[in-house]
Regions:
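C-terminal motif of bacterial Sec signal peptides marking the signal peptidase cleavage site
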Residues: 27-32
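Bacterial signal peptide processing site
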Residues: 34-37
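Extracellular/periplasmic juxtamembrane helices and adjacent flexible linkers that interface
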Residues: 3-5, 263-370
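Ligand-binding cleft/hinge of the Venus flytrap
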Residues: 63-68, 150-210
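Bacterial N-terminal signal peptides that target proteins for export
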Residues: 3-20
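Periplasmic-binding protein-like
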Residues: 128-136, 195-198, 205-206, 236-267, ...
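Ligand-binding pocket segment of bilobal, Venus flytrap-like solute-binding proteins
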Residues: 184-249, 255
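N-terminal segment of the mature folded domain
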Residues: 39-166, 304, 362, 366-367
């Protein structure tokens, strides 16, 4: 069972800046129900700071964690928002024991700030706790007949996506569009031209992936660039939309890490997230569970699930279809981290460095201030 209560006060670990204090005002709290005496609380509290998309999955995992010996006396405070904004807020002092962010570079910022150990990604899954794929959300009946990436740059097709300047989800979207060209025989110049045409068609450039979904559900645009799990979760919430899994797309790999001065229970939490029950809950909320041997391929039997258990999937018999060309950071873009593409695509031009290809495409489209 999960109940709500007020967030715990700021700890003495880091002095929060005004930015961190403002963000903390929006924090939600989940608490595992225990059997302690009425009015008394001996709970240890884990502060989770994450990007917006996995909030429902983390809530479900917390409910299962509360049933274990390690989690029965553990409560949670949570804060969710755009990945880059959340990472910067933690660096500025927002209280956190565990971060669940969209891209590894947002964790790297915390490593450089001395808040997360440099060994955070040394485990068998290299710091990744959840995965999904980039899909193309469309209107009922797919009136624009969107079958893949090339349809998004046609005249009259209106696209909704988050802004890569604030959103990690948007960076995965842009990387998938880039890879559609470069990993199918195109040159980087052709890929840059494709991105320019794509952002010319963007009609809503939101702060986070969740905001992009909300915008699309509100009637904006013809196509939504989204995580597959966002489409599945929307259907679970009675707001489903059709989506296309492109023949070429990217495996989204979301990192999780505990902070250097985290409460001891945070390590138990991370172990649970990476374990069978944690990954099972991710699957039930539309994420593709971790699979080191075959990334992006779901082994239902190992999780005690049947395909039909994934409510809201477009095809109940095949909720996580095999992608013909599933690109990964490590194999296709100079990974395992973002170093091979971060500055090339998303450089902000500070300190005299050149602006990235995606940054320029957005500026040239006139959408940078949306």
């Amino acid at each position: 069972m999960v109940t709500a209560r007020l967030p715990r006060p700021w700890g003495a670990r880091r002095r929060p800046t005004a930015l961190a204090v403002a963000l903390s005002a929006a924090a939600l709290v989940l608490t595992g129900c225990g059997s302690g005496a009425s009015g008394e609380s001996s709970e240890e509290t884990i502060s989770i700071v994450g990007f917006a998309v996995p909030e429902a999955a983390n809530k479900a995992i917390a409910a299962e964690f509360a049933k274990t010996a390690a989690g029965e006396d553990v409560g949670f405070t949570t804060s969710y928002g755009a990945s880059g904004d959340q990472s910067r807020a933690v660096a500025a002092g927002l209280d956190a024991d565990y971060v669940h962010l969209s891209v590894g570079s947002d964790v790297d910022r915390l490593v450089e700030a001395g808040l997360v150990a440099r060994t955070w990604d040394d485990g068998p899954h290299k710091g990744i706790v959840s995965t999904s794929v980039v899909v193309l959300g469309v209107r009922d009946g797919n009136p624009k007949d969107v079958q893949g990436w090339d349809d998004l740059v046609q005249p009259g097709v209106e696209v909704v996506t988050a802004n890569p300047a604030s959103s990690g989800a948007a960076r995965w979207n842009a990387l998938a569009a880039w890879g559609h060209v470069t990993e199918n025989g195109g040159t980087e110049a052709e890929a840059a031209d494709f991105l320019g045409k794509l952002f010319d068609n963007v009609v809503s450039l939101t702060n986070s992936g969740r905001d992009a979904t909300t915008s699309f559900l509100g009637g904006t645009g013809d196509v939504l660039l989204a995580y597959e799990n966002e489409a599945i979760l929307a259907a679970q919430n009675g707001q489903g939309f059709e989506y296309v899994v492109p023949e070429t797309t990217v495996l989204i790999e979301n990192p999780g890490a505990i902070l250097e001065d985290a409460t001891p229970a945070a390590a138990d939490w991370l172990d649970f997230v990476l374990g069978t029950e944690g990954q099972r809950q991710f699957a039930l909320k539309g994420f593709r569970p971790l699979n080191a041997a075959q990334p992006g391929v779901v082994d239902f039997a190992s999780l005690g699930l049947d395909p039909a258990d994934i409510e809201g999937a477009q095809d109940p018999g095949d909720p996580f279809p095999v992608v013909p060309k599933l690109l990964t950071l490590e194999r296709d873009f100079g990974g395992p981290g973002w170093d091979g593409v971060k500055d090339k695509l998303f450089g902000d031009g500070q300190d005299g460095a050149p602006k990235g290809i995606v940054t320029l495409a957005i500026e040239q489209s006139g959408k940078a201030t949306q």
